[in-house]
From Swiss-Prot:
Superkingdom in the source lineage: Bacteria
Family annotation (PANTHER family): RHODANESE-LIKE DOMAIN-CONTAINING PROTEIN 4, CHLOROPLASTIC
SUPFAM superfamilies named among the record's database cross-references: Rhodanese/Cell cycle control phosphatase
Annotated ranges, domain Rhodanese: 17-117
Xref: Gene3D superfamilies: Rhodanese-like domain (3.40.250.10)
InterPro entries: Rhodanese-like_dom (IPR001763), Rhodanese-like_dom_sf (IPR036873), STR4-like (IPR044240)
Signal sequence, renumbered to the chain: none
Record's protein name: Uncharacterized protein RC0915
Length: 123
């Protein structure tokens, strides 16, 4: 199965309605601190694991979600590019229910993104 693109509003709906779904935010620590982070009531549903310049991404990912091979996993970055690469990478190691949030946290040329769609977020 290949990575599917999904908009932030649909991803949010699936995240809050499915106990087997979680979000991996692959932005940098600076982005999390300066721009904000997604907020979900269930804190265990959001994983912060930077993709950029992280040679240990796979090991770190597996140490956090090793028992969730059948989970629905949403990947998020600023605009949908890094998250797509990370989602493909994780799909290639055996996780089959991976989605890329194509409009990202801040949006892109076509779409608003998590923050501009007024989905829950915080600093």
């Amino acid at each position: 199965m290949s990575v599917q693109n999904i908009c932030s509003t649909k991803a949010y709906d699936m995240l809050i309605s499915n106990d087997n779904a979680f979000l991996v935010d692959v932005r940098t620590r600076e982005e999390w601190q300066q721009v904000g982070i997604p907020h979900l009531d269930n804190k265990n549903k959001v994983i912060f694991l930077s993709w950029q310049l992280n040679k240990d991404f796979e090991d770190n990912f597996l140490s956090i979600v090793n028992d969730k091979i059948h989970a629905i996993i949403f990947f998020l970055c600023r605009s949908g590019y890094r998250s797509f690469i990370a989602a493909n990478f994780i799909t290639n190691i055996g996780y089959k229910n991976c989605y890329n949030i194509s409009d990202g946290f801040e949006g892109n040329n076509q779409d608003k993104g998590w923050k501009q769609n007024n989905l829950p977020w915080q600093f």
